[in-house]
From Swiss-Prot:
A GO-annotated cellular component: cytosolic large ribosomal subunit
Assembly and binders: Part of the 50S ribosomal subunit. Contacts protein L32.
Species annotation: Streptococcus pneumoniae serotype 4 (strain ATCC BAA-334 / TIGR4)
SUPFAM superfamilies: Prokaryotic ribosomal protein L17 (SSF64263)
Similarity annotation: Belongs to the bacterial ribosomal protein bL17 family.
GO BP annotations listed: translation
Gene Ontology molecular function, alphabetical: structural constituent of ribosome
Organismal lineage: Bacteria, Bacillati, Bacillota, Bacilli, Lactobacillales
Keyword Ribosomal protein: yes
The keyword ATP-binding is assigned to this record: no
Protein name: Large ribosomal subunit protein bL17
InterPro entries given in the database record: Ribosomal_bL17, Ribosomal_bL17_CS, Ribosomal_bL17_sf
Keywords: Ribonucleoprotein, Ribosomal protein
């Protein structure tokens, strides 16, 4: 089996994977179900590999998948302006250089206790 269906149609599944991948790149750690964590591991690894390549084509490929969300906002008192960093900028400027010497294995999945409502196996996925 090449992928998990996760009980959704293909468009819903792709949207969910894009959202979770973007959230992981922004927050660097999220809590989700084990099945979802194992699926987004694949996409996050691909995005970080694209970030390490760093050329224009890699940036465009990553931009086609990662949502255009603000990762952080800073206020500069000298210029009296706010500067914001998107998830894509964070991927290429902060996350990718951190793994320059590492060949794969950028994420870690830690199993936690089951969810209370439906006993779904939960996991924390984080960037190493």
């Amino acid at each position: 089996m090449a992928y998990r269906k996760l009980g959704r149609t293909s468009s819903q599944r792709k949207a969910m994977l894009r959202d979770l991948t973007t959230d992981l790149l922004i927050n660097e750690s999220i809590v989700t179900t084990e099945a979802r964590a194992k699926e987004i591991r694949k996409t996050v690894e691909k995005m970080i590999t694209l970030g390490k390549r760093g050329d224009l084509h890699a940036r465009r490929q990553a931009a086609a998948f990662v949502r255009n969300e603000i990762a952080s906002e800073n206020y500069d008192e000298a210029t009296d302006k706010y500067t914001s960093t998107t998830a894509l900028q964070k991927l290429f400027s902060e996350i990718a250089p951190r793994y320059a010497e590492r060949n794969g294995g950028y994420t870690r999945i830690l199993k936690t206790e089951s969810r209370r409502g439906d006993a779904a196996p939960m996991a924390i996925i984080e960037l190493v």
